[in-house]
């Protein structure tokens, strides 16, 4: 069982500015989150319904408690503060879920 944070970004008004900020500032901050096991970024995400997403991000921890602790840490607060800046550049939907392998 793993805990995951997922963010779906809509296409930003200025993709170049968004990409530069995300890759130069946000990724280095998020990589320091305690207990982070995996950080995946997907581009040109095709939606089954509606408009495609610009980018999908998935961060994974071993447990929900570890995810919560990471978000409450100084590194988590710094990452969340920067995420607020990203939300000025692109609309984002985010969620947390606990996953269990089905197969």
Describe each PLM feature range.
Residues 1-103:
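Macromolecular interaction modules
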